[in-house]
Each structure stands twice: as structure tokens, then as C-alpha cells.
Curated annotation (Swiss-Prot):
The keyword Chaperone does not apply. InterPro entries: Ribosomal_bL19, Ribosomal_bL19_sf, Translation_prot_SH3-like_sf. GO terms for cellular component: cytosolic large ribosomal subunit. It holds the Pfam family Ribosomal_L19. GO terms for molecular function: structural constituent of ribosome. The keyword Ribonucleoprotein applies. Belongs to the bacterial ribosomal protein bL19 family. The gene is rplS. This is Large ribosomal subunit protein bL19. This protein is located at the 30S-50S ribosomal subunit interface and may play a role in the structure and function of the aminoacyl-tRNA binding site. It comes from the Bacteria. Keywords: Ribonucleoprotein, Ribosomal protein. One of its GO terms (biological process) is translation.
Amino acid sequence: MNTIIKNIEDAQLKAQAPEFRVGDTVRVSAKIKEGNRERIQVFEGTVLKKQGTGVRATFTVRKISNGVGVEKTWPLHSPIVEKVEVVRRGKARRAKLNYLRQRTGKAAKVKELVR
């Protein structure tokens, strides 16, 4: 039974999964369907967490919009996610950056990783 599930999940994985880490600033292009129209909506922010493996892998991105924190979580291998491009590499020392939710202004920034 386990191999059957694994075969089905492997068929649903994206061939080119985007490469990014927690702390990176990313620009996510997602398909939004409104009625009979379909458009691409861009969401740019800091990756707070990545969790799960395989088809169940998800990532959460946070940005501040008009002084209000907005977080969105997407499945990594979803067909809704058109592309994920890394705008800036961040240096994170934690796997989950949940502490950024309480911070505002410059304190909510992640240091840039120089490679």
C-alpha cells in the first residue's frame, strides 16, 4: 500500500521545485481564478517557514501591507504556484521565524546573506 501512495505522489511532484530557504525574500507568482478569468497575482515577502516533504511540503511568506502583517501559505508543488523567484538571500539561524510576527519596522528585517 505504501509504494502505491508513493508512486502517485511522485507523479504529482513538480520537476523543477524552486530553491529557497527560510529567511529569503521571495516573489511568489500565483494563479488566481475570478469567475471565468484567470490572472497572475504577485506576493513578495519573507519566507517564515517551510514544512513537510514531498507533495505535502508547504511554505509561508509574510509581508507588511499598509501597516498590517499578511501571511500566505502555499503548497510547494501546487499548480497554483506559477513561479517562486528569490529577490534577496537572508541569513536565518532558525528553521521557523515566528518571532518576526511580534516585530515591527527595522527589527522585523532578516540580515542579508553575502555569498
